[in-house]
Design a protein with these regions (language model features):
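Structured catalytic-domain cores with a bias toward divalent-metal coordination
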Residues: 1-458
Length: 458
């Protein structure tokens, strides 16, 4: 919010000429209001307490980008669909590590399926430019989000491979063809320092965008037009090592007594330590992801409607009762009808275009034959249990009934749709139990309930 007065007062006239800002000051309003001194106890302030990571449903909003289970995530997706921003930023404070010397770390979308030009602009131009500017103006070192792990030859600064999944907001931005940026201020830097350096990030990144508006618009427009049909896209990925070592900065922290909770000290890296207390090391950097498994992006995804009742009830894991995303009209209908209603609900939440077939028609494409269908024993983000399928695609010729669901891939959100619908995706509808009305049936179905085709379906 600190950027608003400077813009209103005329200090940022360049922004006024070339940018429109949409500001959500508090994404997790419910969690923000649940202030307690015991929340995030080791974080350096505010010492009088802070809110919770989870919202009122007990869900982490930064895990809701694909399943769309919260009102907050749905509101964000609606805003992105309606306003079509070119750049989006998510501002965080990290959980912290004992001796990182970076007051600010940042990240972009790590998903390997992002448009190449989009990632080049962010990683090769925008982020290096603002990092250099902040170092020159303020003397502060910034780098990509991560932490040191490993010993000996394996010691390296590593990001988190989980961030390649669009359940995380910054990657969700990326697979929607938006230039997504994540900031993670260091939790053991003082509260003042975190606020100030976040302002610097906004100041420099917005100034860059304002002065490179034509480039930004062009990159996003090209990503929206670019067809991924027929490409091999990632469904699983891993971090890879950068070709050159990177300078990683370290600085000590101290334990400080919290005046409100005597037995819960917090960690602090005091302001003004000076260079004498700062060390650095040249380390390998694992900060981008490459595919470990790929598959074909089709022209269309199809969910054939079925009016046949199941022979056994689904052993499904569903969202919490207060969550969004259930089948319209409750649990009525066949398993396929309930599943389709849940899929349509989420497609609409994301803004993904779809259609319903008006008449029976021949279908020629592929179906995924299931070899194994497993459900994780642990609950995650409410009552979800991760589902994983193995198997193989095989050719299929069949009649597609009227009332079937068709999701075309000639649309700007095709990258997101691919991740949501592929049976091997580690962050799609299958993984999040959205298809469990069918996939949870006993005995397990022989085929994945979503078909793909390189042919158009009307």
């Amino acid at each position: 919010m600190g950027c608003v007065p400077s813009r209103a007062s005329g200090e940022r006239n360049a922004w006024l000429k070339t940018t429109v800002l949409l500001i959500n000051p508090i994404y997790n309003a419910d969690g923000n209001e649940r202030v307690a001194v015991t929340n995030r106890g080791s974080q350096a302030g505010p010492v009088g307490g802070m809110g919770t990571r989870e919202n009122a449903q007990g869900l982490d909003l930064n895990r809701d980008g694909t399943k769309m289970e919260t009102a907050e995530a749905r509101s964000m997706a609606s805003l992105l669909t309606r306003y079509q921003p070119h750049v989006a930023m998510d501002l965080h404070t990290t959980d912290g590590s004992a001796n990182s010397g970076f007051n600010m770390t940042y990240e972009t979308s790590l998903n390997p399926n992002n448009a190449n030009a989009q990632m080049r602009l962010l990683r090769d131009e925008l982020l290096p430019a603002i990092t250099t500017a902040v170092k020159a103006k303020h003397g502060s070192d910034w780098f990509y989000y991560g932490g040191v792990s490993g010993t000996g030859d394996q010691r390296a600064w590593r990001s988190d491979a989980e961030l390649a999944k669009p359940r995380y907001t910054s990657t969700y931005f990326g697979v929607r063809n938006i230039l997504g940026l994540l900031t993670e201020t260091y939790s053991y830097a003082s509260f003042k320092t975190r606020i100030v350096e976040t302002y610097w990030f906004l100041e420099e990144s917005l100034s860059y965008v304002a002065s490179h508006g034509d480039t930004v618009r062009d990159v996003v427009a090209k990503a929206n037009r670019e067809s991924i049909i027929g490409q091999q896209l990632a469904v699983r990925q891993q971090l890879v090592k950068a070709p050159v070592l990177q300078k990683i900065v370290f600085a000590p922290t101290i334990s400080v007594r919290n005046p409100y909770v005597a037995d819960r000290p917090y960690r602090l890296r005091p302001d003004g330590l000076g260079n004498a207390h700062v060390t650095s090391e040249m380390l390998p950097f694992f900060g981008t992801a490459e595919p470990t498994e790929t598959t074909l992006a089709p022209r269309v995804w199809v969910v054939p409607i079925s009016t046949t009742a199941a022979s056994a009830p689904a052993q499904a894991t569903t969202a919490a009762p207060t969550a969004f995303g259930g089948a319209r009209g409750g649990a009525a209908g066949t398993p396929t009808q309930r599943m389709m209603a849940a899929v349509i609900d989420r497609l609409e939440a994301h803004g993904i275009r779809y259609s319903i077939t008006a008449a029976d028609q021949p279908f020629s494409g592929d179906r995924f034959k299931i070899a194994t269908n497993t459900l994780d024993a642990r609950e995650y983000q409410g009552s979800h249990k991760a589902r994983t399928l193995t198997g193989a695609w095989e050719a299929a010729e069949q009649t597609l009934p009227a009332g079937s669901l068709v999701i075309p891939m000639d649309q700007p959100l095709a990258r997101l749709a691919f991740i949501l619908l592929d049976p091997r995706s580690d962050d799609g509808f299958m993984w999040w139990n959205v298809l469990d009305a069918v996939l949870g049936l006993s005995p397990t179905p022989a085929y994945y309930p979503v078909l793909r085709s390189m042919n158009a379906v009307k």
